[in-house]
Regions:
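Hydrophobic transmembrane alpha-helices and their membrane-interface caps
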Residues: 4-65, 506-589, 595-614, 639
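Transmembrane helices with small-residue packing motifs
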Residues: 32, 36, 103-111, 181-218, ...
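Transmembrane alpha-helices and their membrane-interface boundaries in multi-pass membrane transporters
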Residues: 49-63, 84-104, 111-150, 254, ...
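Signature of alpha-helical transmembrane segments and their immediate interfacial
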Residues: 84, 151-200, 667-677
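Extracytoplasmic/periplasmic
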Residues: 198-261, 275, 312-345
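Solvent-exposed, membrane-proximal periplasmic/extracellular interface segments of envelope transport
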Residues: 222-301, 356-373
């Protein structure tokens, strides 16, 4: 792409050399910080590569322009670099300050993107050093020549001529331009409201986890027998490469690793197995996609609604009614109610007086029953340095019936045997496996399992159902753990965006020595969102923590073109040009470097935007936001910046005329008073 615009191998090599040099310096700084190569740091390097050449392109373009009036290469390199030094420093700093809040964030966002922020900061500093020190040096050593009459130059000349004509017409219709831009912005906001939201996009890592929860007291043999069904399902699935099973207590997990070239995605296999699990009423089965990345924590096809209340009976009824309504929603495979997961307990109540007659205590009776039902570990055998626990159990089926248990003979202290039924009775009761409370209130969770294709539609339908359901006075909906985490992280990101906006404004105010020009450039940031939201909508992507990170990064990139444009226009006005002529000339001269810097960044983002690789989808939203935002901002910068410039300049002239008129009237008043005296 560089060679396409320059048409000179040496010029392309000079600019291209800034990438490996900047990358090398970045890796050194990353190593000093103790960063590792992972999906986040590699993704940040991909993002940074496209921006590493921006400053170098601006510098060499300026050197080429200076060489036309200054034959001496060294002089052209010095003057060309000096001309854009302030602009590229300001542009680099605006990019850096955007990532500073990112690098200092806490919580899940900080864990995920702290290294991303620091890595891009290191890359921008390294690219600035390369652009200001190495590009002018290489320019004088390699002596590149700007080729003319290139195919791209012919297109650019035609486009520049057309742009100049259009820009002059649009500058005379400033209200229309602003009105159309605002209308597009409003339409984009409405479009953004149709996009689904999630915390982190789920990566397809090719791992499916089946978690089976059994009722407490279920023997290992029965658990193993139940799991054989899932083992058979895994064996019959052609996309499963291998699987493993682990059993611990009353739960078991089957983890299936899928082949690389599979016919179904991980989400489709999860949906398929969830439909099978929905028909299993004798066990609680949860099927999810799994993996090693942080996204696996979020990649679930279930959605949880929590209810709170101080009346447990009303809470249970409200949860049961809500569960029944949720089951009617399209896309919901099954629902679970945490209060429904109760266990029927058979309590053996020992009469202490009757037990005392036989020299027994309730504790002794309880220990005997425990040993009979669960077995006991009387001794441990050591053989060749290894210890083996000896476990004694009654034969299977000896006491699996309450009548048999009540016939259990207990040895008394008098040397006789008494049946358990003579000193105890059986009472039945329902007992919750788990009783949840939060802030002193009972809490129940209604969990819905949905198909991956309709997960967001089902979630929206469930939320609408909860919003329109009239609950008893003692029952109120509460945020689930995942919803609370999502709200906290999104709020932290929005705060980071606000801090970054303020820092960018301060940097530009110092650069232009005027808050007016800074505000003018900042106004282009919201309009860049037009392209971002439009591309997210076209690709049916979600708004997530990762895509919001893209919005944050977009701020630092978008203003760079605006800084170059305004800085160039101010310099031309200082040389005596009129405002309109300076804006047209600035747009014409900055057109090629703006297009080059934008295209290099966009092209570097395309592989990430396509979501290539198993984990590519995780960073895809960020790339789509930047690609769409940069495309829109480049077009709007060339049109809106001149329009805003004229509007602000007109107001500034009116304010100056009003100030002069006021000062003149004050002087006239003082002169009249002096004459009267």
């Amino acid at each position: 792409m560089l060679f396409l615009f320059f048409g000179d191998f040496k010029a392309s090599l000079i600019v291209g050399a800034s990438m490996p040099i900047s990358l090398f310096l970045t890796l050194i700084l990353m190593s000093m910080m103790g960063f590792s190569m992972n999906i986040v740091t590699l993704g940040s390097l991909v993002i940074a590569i496209g921006m590493m050449v921006d400053a170098s392109i601006v510098v060499i373009e300026s050197c080429f322009r200076r060489q036309k009036s200054t034959p001496d290469l060294k002089q052209a390199a010095l003057e060309g670099t000096k001309e854009v030094t302030a602009s590229i420093i300001a542009s680099t700093i605006t990019t850096i300050v955007v990532y500073l809040p990112l690098a200092t964030m806490k919580g899940l966002s900080g864990q995920m993107f702290e290294q991303l922020g620091f890595t891009i900061v290191f890359a921008m500093l390294a690219s600035l050093i390369a652009a200001m020190m190495l590009v002018p040096l290489f320019y004088t050593v390699f002596k590149p020549k700007e080729k003319e009459n290139l195919p791209i130059d012919k297109l650019l000349k035609k486009f520049t001529t057309w742009y100049q004509k259009i820009l002059r017409k649009l500058m005379k219709r400033r209200k229309t331009v602003v009105g159309v831009a605002v209308a597009l912005m409003i339409g984009t906001v409405l479009l953004a409201g149709t996009l689904d939201m999630e915390l982190i996009p789920a990566a397809d890592e090719g791992v499916v986890a089946v978690t089976v929860n059994f009722r407490s007291g279920t023997t290992l043999e029965k658990e193993d027998e139940a799991l054989k069904l899932w083992e058979q399902i895994a064996e019959e699935e052609p996309d499963v490469e291998f699987y493993s099973v682990s059993i611990s207590g009353s739960s078991a997990t089957l983890t299936a690793d899928l082949i690389k070239k599979r016919t179904l995605t991980t989400a489709q296999i999860v949906d398929k197995w969830n439909e099978i699990a929905a028909g299993m009423t004798d066990m609680d089965v949860t099927v999810t996609s799994s993996g090693s990345s942080m996204s696996s924590m979020m990649s679930t096809s279930s959605y949880e609604i929590d209810l709170q209340g101080n009346d447990r009976a009303e809470l249970a009824q409200a949860a049961e009614d809500l569960q029944a309504e949720i089951e009617k929603i399209d896309g919901v495979v099954k629902t679970e109610n945490s209060l429904v997961n109760s266990t029927t307990l058979a309590k053996v109540v020992v009469d202490p007086l009757k037990a005392m007659q036989y020299g027994l205590t309730p504790i002794q009776v309880g220990m005997t029953i425990h040993n009979v039902l669960s077995g006991m570990n009387p001794l441990t055998i050591t053989n060749d340095g290894s210890e083996y626990a000896v476990w004694l159990e009654y034969p299977e089926g000896s006491y699996d019936d309450l009548n048999l248990l009540m016939d259990l003979g207990l040895d008394t202290s008098f040397g006789t045997v008494v049946p358990l039924r003579d000193i105890a009775e059986i009472n039945y009761a329902q007992s919750q496996e788990t009783i949840m409370k939060q802030d002193g209130l009972y809490q129940v969770s209604v969990t819905s399992t949905m198909t991956s294709e309709k997960i967001f539609d089902a979630q929206n339908a469930i939320n609408d159902l909860v919003d329109h359901t009239v609950f008893p006075d003692s029952v109120t909906p509460a945020d689930s753990m995942m919803t609370g985490m999502m709200n906290d992280e999104l709020q932290a990101l929005l705060q980071a965006i606000l801090v970054a906006t303020f820092l960018v404004f301060l940097v530009m105010a110092m650069q232009f020595e005027s808050p007016r020009f800074s505000f003018m450039v900042m106004m282009c940031i919201p309009f860049a969102l037009i392209g971002s939201f439009l591309l997210l909508f076209i690709t049916q992507s979600t708004i997530s923590m990762v895509s919001l990170m893209g919005f944050l990064m977009l701020m630092g990139i978008v203003v760079n073109n605006g800084i170059l444009f305004v800085d160039s226009a101010n310099m031309l006005r200082e040389e005596g040009m009129s405002t309109e002529d300076a804006l047209v000339a600035s747009g014409s001269t900055r057109l090629r470097p703006i297009l080059m810097t934008t295209l290099t960044t966009i092209l570097s983002m395309i592989p990430m935007g396509l979501g290539l690789g198993d984990n590519g989808v995780m960073m895809q939203g960020m790339a789509l936001v930047i690609i769409g935002g940069l495309t829109a901002s480049t077009i709007l910068t060339l049109i809106l910046i001149p329009t805003f410039y004229l509007i602000f300049d007109k107001r500034s002239r009116q304010e100056r005329r009003a100030a002069k008129k006021l000062a003149k009237s004050q002087r006239s008043g003082k002169t009249g008073d002096a004459e009267n005296e």
